[in-house]
């Protein structure tokens, strides 16, 4: 026991277990003025935005009376987003279709980029590239945008009377109703971040253990769940906006 205690004390004194110095993951930053900008997220987000803009321009630059395959695909996506928005928001869904559609497409392409794009081959001074939604900064930003959107929807529809919802059906529920508005963005951000991070980690581990056959069905499952996560986020965002405009829980 004395020998073991001495060994542990020696290790601690030599600093081999300085927990405060341990970092989970590394990040690549740009210094802009007095601010540190998370470059990894910006780079991958710009790539996703470029993919969305480029594919949209290519598909609809010459609209045809008889739609082409690309035009048909984007019309189908638009109809799908309109249906989701109308179902969750109601008859006043029109102005919110661009917002819900942008959320869905950005998250969908971001999620798929983690599985389909070879981010790892791009070398950075620190850290590595991954899907934008694999970073908590991205998912929190998307969730906060959703929060701003449903507050704006409620205030624009009802004015200051929107805040009366916090004391309905009884003022006793005021703390719970306030807490609910904080838990919505938290649940949105952590659900998306956790699922995408876990999916990528599972694929990485399986590829390192069995690099040929086993990871392939897992990757297909990851693509499916990534699409579902994008749909869940967009659907919940639309539901929160519809709820704030209707004033019911």
From Swiss-Prot:
Coiled-coil boundaries: none
GO molecular function, one term: proton-transporting ATP synthase activity, rotational mechanism
Subcellular compartments: Plastid, Chloroplast thylakoid membrane
Pfam families membership: ATP-synt_A
Main location: plastid
TM spans (from-to): 40-60, 97-117, 136-156, 201-221, 222-242
InterPro entries on file: ATP_syn_F0_a_bact/chloroplast, ATP_synth_F0_asu, ATP_synth_F0_asu_AS, F0_ATP_A_sf
Listed name of the protein: ATP synthase subunit a, chloroplastic
Organism, scientific name: Olimarabidopsis pumila
Name of encoding gene: atpI
